[in-house]
Amino acid sequence: MVEPLLSGIVLGLVPITITGLLVTAYLQYRRGDSLNF
């Protein structure tokens, strides 16, 4: 009963973590871009 729960949690968290990392990296890139200009 634990394995399906863990797999569900992982499957739910992985896309959220990836999107979070992409958003933070994009925001940092935009911030550095605006600071350079």
UniProtKB/Swiss-Prot annotation:
Major location (coarse): plastid
Residue spans crossing the bilayer: 5-25
Assigned GO CC terms: chloroplast thylakoid membrane; cytochrome b6f complex
UniProt keyword annotation of Transmembrane present: yes
UniProt keywords, alphabetically: Chloroplast, Electron transport, Membrane, Photosynthesis, Plastid, Thylakoid, Transmembrane, Transmembrane helix, Transport
Domain of life: Eukaryota
Pfam families in UniProt: PetG
Membrane topology: Single-pass membrane protein
UniProt cross-references to InterPro entries, sorted A to Z: Cyt_6/f_cplx_su5, Cyt_6/f_cplx_su5_sf
Similarity section: Belongs to the PetG family.
Subunit structure as annotated in this protein's UniProt entry: The 4 large subunits of the cytochrome b6-f complex are cytochrome b6, subunit IV (17 kDa polypeptide, PetD), cytochrome f and the Rieske protein, while the 4 small subunits are PetG, PetL, PetM and PetN. The complex functions as a dimer.
Stated name of the protein: Cytochrome b6-f complex subunit 5
Source species taxonomy: Eukaryota, Viridiplantae, Chlorophyta, Ulvophyceae, OUU clade
